[in-house]
Amino acid sequence: EKQGAGIQLSMSARITIRNNSIYDLPRAGINVSEGTWGGHLIEGNDVFDTVLETGDHGSFNSWGRDRYWHPDRNVMDEFAKEHPQMVFRDATETTVIRNNRWRCDHGWDIDLDDGSSNYHIYNNLCLHGGLKLREGFARTVENNIMVNNTFHPHVWFANSQDIFRHNIVTTPYRPIQVKEWGKETDTNFFVTKQGLEQA
């Protein structure tokens, strides 16, 4: 499977990715392949026509799989209760994703997968694939607009510390295996009454 990305970050800190047009790619436009060490700033980018030859990915994609991460959800739920600060031993600084335009017709516009933790995502325009948060911790998502799609919370852990607030979504949330709704999921605007009723 092709893993090439327009911009690839791995085991790095405090990288700024600013004011780029990234498009026509087999996989992600921007990919962060570990949470170690974080502190990145991703802003002012226009990323589209991505994930053209693969699947299960996004225009922005990340995965954590840091030292704390375990594929068994029950193990992670217990771990999060007992050691809530462990996730910050690898993702030591918050990665900021702001003021970008994203479009992915074959996945998610923004896809935080497999333990991606310690992110602040705000003021982004997502034009097609919505935004996915799976199996991570300490992600704040606010003031984003999701056109033609919505918020995809997948397999959230107990005590995730996740926040999803002040966003505009145009279709109902699409949760998968969500028992816990994080620290805050509130004050979001739904275009339809159905979306609000299902939230």
Predicted segments with their positions:
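Consensus "Asn ladder" position of solenoid repeat domains
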Residues: N20, L25, H40, N45, ...
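Surface-exposed acidic, glycine/proline-enriched linker/cap segments
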Residues: E1-G4, G64-E93, I97-N99
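Right-handed parallel beta-helix
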Residues: E1-I30, G39-D46
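Short, flexible loop/turn elements at secondary-structure junctions
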Residues: M11-I15, S21, E34-T36, V51, ...
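Solenoid scaffold repeats with emphasis on beta-solenoid/beta-helix
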Residues: R14-I15, N20, G39-H40, N45, ...
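Active-site core of glycosidic bond-cleaving carbohydrate-active enzymes
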Residues: T94, G115-K132, A138-N149, I163-H166, ...
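Leucine-rich repeat domain C-terminal region
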Residues: F189-K193
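Short glycine/acidic-rich loop motifs that flank beta-strands on beta-rich extracellular proteins
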Residues: E1-A5, P26-G35, V51-G58, D72, ...
